[in-house]
Design a protein with these regions (language model features):
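Bacterial N-terminal signal peptides that target proteins for export
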Residues: 1-12
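Intrinsically disordered, low-complexity regions
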Residues: 1-2, 17, 50, 104
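Helix-centric, low-specificity signal for extended rod-like, repetitive segments
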Residues: 2-3, 18, 40, 202
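Compositionally biased, low-structure terminal segments
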Residues: 6, 17-18, 122, 163
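Terminal low-complexity, poorly structured segments
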Residues: 11-12, 16, 47
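Hydrophobic h-region of N-terminal signal peptides that target proteins for export
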Residues: 14-24
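Glycoside hydrolase catalytic-domain context in secreted enzymes
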Residues: 24-257
Length: 257
């Protein structure tokens, strides 16, 4: 139980900070103090609940208020929703969390904003061929402006998996086989999405993905295992992840399954 609590103490602040910092103007010290005080009030179930991200792409206002997800939100068992968009719908669901849950913790609303939102840009593999970091950053900036206007606060991008096996069906989601290029693009996209580190309403939180080394899945099979040496891991696959973290990415995909 103590180990679970310690893990929640590490992870939950990131989720809570991400939720609140998208629209907040508080200093990091004030925010840390606010989160510490809030976590002292949370039950273990509520802390674990912050790790839940149900998929609700087709949810409507009426369904949201009568569904099991709605009950879970009210109990503080949901940290965010995936694939729900539209300001009106998001507002109604957010009110469930803020007004009807015990602690009023707002939800995150995440979506795969991969290469544009309303304005569609070339796929990431295509963008990488330009080697134009300014244009790539601008594409992420535009996507953030459009997505945030529709209520989205979190994108599962950039995808920084180094991909060298064309049999893998997700090669087009990343920047290809070059670790250096992947690292430069990772930094550019994090800057584009997050801008001034999510201090404005038109900036959204980026999530570097997928779980490290996923681009080297055995035989190019999706969701397969990876087997490689530590030398190869650090020299060929980890550079883009490190670059995204150094650029201040707001979240990291901790698993892919």
């Amino acid at each position: 139980m103590n180990r679970i609590f310690q893990r929640m103490k590490q992870v939950a602040p990131m989720l809570l900070f991400a939720t609140l910092s998208v629209h907040a103007q508080k200093s990091p010290q004030d925010m840390n103090r606010f989160i510490d005080n809030l976590m002292k009030k949370m039950t273990l179930e509520e802390k674990i609940g912050q790790l839940n991200l149900p998929v609700t792409g087709e949810i409507t206002t009426g369904q949201a208020k009568s569904s099991d997800i709605s009950a879970r939100i009210k109990r503080g068992e949901v940290g965010g929703l995936f694939n729900l968009k539209g300001v009106a719908r998001i507002k109604d669901v957010q009110e469930l969390a803020v007004k009807e849950s015990r602690l009023g913790i707002p939800l995150l609303f995440g979506m795969d904003v991969i290469h544009g939102y309303e304005t569609i840009f070339p796929i990431p593999l295509g963008l990488s061929c330009t080697w134009d970091m300014k244009a790539i950053e601008e594409s992420a900036r535009i996507a953030a402006i459009e997505a945030s206007a529709d209520g989205i606060s979190w994108t599962f991008s950039p995808m920084v998996d180094v991909s060298r096996d064309p049999r893998w069906g997700r090669v087009s989601e990343g920047s290809g086989e070059d670790p250096f290029l992947g690292a430069e693009i990772a930094k550019a996209m994090v800057r584009g999405y997050q801008g001034g580190q999510m201090k404005r309403n038109d900036e959204i939180m980026a999530c570097v993905k997928h779980f490290a080394l996923y681009g080297a899945s055995e035989a190019g099979r999706d969701y397969n295992t990876v087997d490689m040496s530590r030398q190869r891991m650090f020299n060929e696959y980890m550079l883009p992840y490190q670059a995204a973290v150094d650029a201040g990415v707001g979240s990291v995909m901790a698993s892919i399954n």
